[in-house]
Amino acid sequence: MTCEEKIWELRQIIEEQLTPLINNDYVLYDLPYYSNIGDLLIWEGELSFLKGLPFKMLECGSAFTSNLKRKIKKDTIILLQGGGNFGDIWDIHEFKRKVIRNYPENRIIIFPQTVFYQKNENMLRDIELMSRHPYLTICARDIHSFEVLKKNFKNTILLVPDMAFCIPVSYTHL
């Protein structure tokens, strides 16, 4: 299997897992308005994936620019950036918690993440909050994260490749 064939295979898995969940207009939050090249590539992959859907992005923003006091219609889906910031290593994770608290009636999808907690009490706090949200889907991008989430969280948990695999292969041939 060539590299391009493997990327195509991973992209197909992403589309099969996520496309059925995004069935309405959406907002995309938690964007990386900071200098982490990997997170910027994930964002580019998310945008490429979303362009293929028949729904409209109503708003996008980072943890620093998103207005979480704004009313969002209940049928609007909230998408949160993927990457490696699920857990207690990065303060930015608190933004996810605020979104989940502020929008209990919206479908929320956390794009593929790596999960890591240094302190068990922080994970227990997240389990308590997130498990109460009836429309939250959390995507893991690696087996370990998937197993941690599946074992501890009561939400829908999916194993989905990193969204950077949705970047068109033609980008690499510039």
Which residues make up each language-model segment?
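Membrane-proximal basic amphipathic "stem/tether" segments
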Residues: 1-22
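Active-site and donor-binding regions of nucleotide-sugar-utilizing enzymes
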Residues: 8-13, 26-148, 152-153, 160-161, ...
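Short, compositionally biased segments
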Residues: 168-169
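Conserved small/polar residues in nucleotide/adenosyl-binding loops
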Residues: 172-173
